[in-house]
Amino acid sequence: MSRPSTPLLDKVPTPDRLRALPERDLPQLAEELRTELIDAVSTTGGHLGAGLGVVELTVALHHVFNTPYDRIIWDVGHQAYPHKILTGRRDRIRTLRQAGGLSGFTKRAESEYDPFGAAHSSTSISAGLGMAVASELSGEKRNVIAVIGDGSMSAGMAYEAMNNAGALDARLIVILNDNDMSIAPPTGAMSAYLARLVSGRTYRSVREAAKQVAQKLPKFLQDKARKSEEYARAFFTGGTLFEELGFYYVGPIDGHNLDHLLPVLKNVRDTQKGPVLIHVVTQKGKGYAPAEAAADKYHGVNKFDVITGKQAKPPANAPSYTKIFGTSLIEEARHDDKIVAVTAAMPTGTGLDLFGEAFPKRVFDVGIAEQHAVTFAAGLASEGYKPFCAIYSTFLQRGYDQVVHDVSIQNLPVRFPIDRAGLVGADGPTHAGSFDTGFLAALPGFVVMAASDEAELRHMVRTAAEYDEGPISFRYPRGDGVGVDLPERGSVLEIGKGRIVREGTKVALLSFGTRLQECLAAAEELGAAGLSTTVVDARFAKPLDHDLIRRLAREHEVLVMVEEGAVGGFGSHVLQFLATDGLLDRGLKVRALTLPDIYQDHGKPDAMYAEAGLDRTGIVRTVFAALHRDELGHEALPTPFRA
């Protein structure tokens, strides 16, 4: 299929060429950039709506500022695709999120135009402030610009950074990309005029002179003068909050109108004092009708037909783990009115949108605020409710102190459904669920489970609902289940007890999580080679099933632990127990298979697990290496690379 015609964009491989264009050509460039973005993402999938919303802003920023000397930091990075196209990566834009291709987020190792990597929200202002201070210490005159969405402004970290920037009076530019119009809409020509006026040198010079005069007044009159000036501008702009944090506020302005953006950005660029916040209002999905009409459905997309907007979705062999969690929690909530659900701005991603439809008064979306979500859930638990605080593994890292201090130390029965456990594929290392088993199983009294299939997940939801003795978690991966039969309602599992799935005598494979299917496939291959193999679904990393592990250690020559997590998790706990119990003193051959001690780059999950040695082939190789043989009894094959 032929690509769209983009004659002007073809002449702009890098920002220096963009800066050479006359301003009259920039609207055409923006339209061609938008067309190229739509076409590229239609072939790869990825984050579409956010990028479409910042096309004009991206063009304006690279036209006004001297990148890469001047630093542009994109919060989260979902919106950075237009930036990548303009910064020397257009020839690879159709490799987005593919193995060996461009990252779906900003990445320092990928380009000098990406000064700071991102994928989690609300980090841009802190990073930008650090860069601005470093620039000042070095005697540099560079501009530092942090672009942050209004959604990311729900996280406390953004305000902590702004408060610090205001106190330091740092030379930092923050662009608030308000794409939900959640703060204030622009008011047409008057808004644009005021933004241009108050961002200019003349206004700011007069303002500084007035401040100097006011400083000679008694303090109570100084305060009144300052408040009068702030509230006079806030009457038009709504910027009082940001002024209180020490920022000079400009806006709101239309983020799709280059005639509005360019003069304001130039004025701010040419002003050398203090932190500035520019409030820009944009529309997610701008310029592509299907995305404008359904912004939520076009935030992250599969490959799609550009003409119809229809996304290609492969047929599912089984319901997704996320859906199974959501429907299972609904079933438990029908039997227990104390069950409530908490999400940190991810109701659809965690399956709690389904719960919210069934029980709208029992679900709480606290915004991008994982720390608050965890302690909010702890407060609910302290009053006898049963909160299920559903958070992706990678985002639970943001609330770990609250897990320790507010939940675990007080032994409060907060339930933690942990979605996106293990490798997540195209989103890469920033979103991989690698560490939760290790950091939760280290906590005294914390029950840590992992579902091996969708039926086990249903059992674990029921088990967590019934468990009131302290905090409990259960992890499960992204994607579809394996197609096992599902009970209408889960059963309560005995805490700390695993299950034997297949009996053998020579080799024992002890699986924690959904690698169970690969263990069963490996057992078939090992059996065909004359090695009778036991396969066990551990279910629990804490408490461990000590009796079962003792039996496996005493009755088998080889014991292999398999998990979808980093070093320091399930396998480490098993090895600690084996050593303490003296079970390593009899010559047992023990191997622990984990994710490698590197940040694996993005790719297809199956290929990534194979690279990690966590597929059938890797498990078989590990067993034969432990026995110093291969399938034919020859010299052992090399073991998988473990960084």
Swiss-Prot record:
Gene Ontology MF: a single term: magnesium ion binding
Pathway: Metabolic intermediate biosynthesis; 1-deoxy-D-xylulose 5-phosphate biosynthesis; 1-deoxy-D-xylulose 5-phosphate from D-glyceraldehyde 3-phosphate and pyruvate: step 1/1
Residue sites binding Mg(2+) per the record: D150, N179
Cofactor: Mg(2+); thiamine diphosphate
This protein's record includes keyword Zinc-finger: no
Disulfide bridge partners, by residue number: none
Chain positions recorded as thiamine diphosphate binding sites: H78, A119, H120, S121, G151, S152, N179, Y288, E370
Biological processes, Gene Ontology terms: 1-deoxy-D-xylulose 5-phosphate biosynthetic process; glyceraldehyde-3-phosphate metabolic process; terpenoid biosynthetic process; thiamine biosynthetic process
Reactions the enzyme catalyzes: D-glyceraldehyde 3-phosphate + pyruvate + H(+) = 1-deoxy-D-xylulose 5-phosphate + CO2
Family annotation (InterPro entries): Dxylulose-5-P_synthase, THDP-binding, Transketo_C/PFOR_II, Transketolase-like_Pyr-bd, Transketolase_BS, Transketolase_C, Transketolase_CS
EC number: 2.2.1.7
Cofactor note (record): Binds 1 Mg(2+) ion per subunit.
Keywords tagged on the record: Isoprene biosynthesis, Magnesium, Metal-binding, Thiamine biosynthesis, Thiamine pyrophosphate, Transferase
UniProt keyword Lyase present: no
Assembly: Homodimer.
Family label: Belongs to the transketolase family. DXPS subfamily.
Entry function: Catalyzes the acyloin condensation reaction between C atoms 2 and 3 of pyruvate and glyceraldehyde 3-phosphate to yield 1-deoxy-D-xylulose-5-phosphate (DXP).
Protein name: 1-deoxy-D-xylulose-5-phosphate synthase
Species: Brucella ovis (strain ATCC 25840 / 63/290 / NCTC 10512)
Gene: dxs
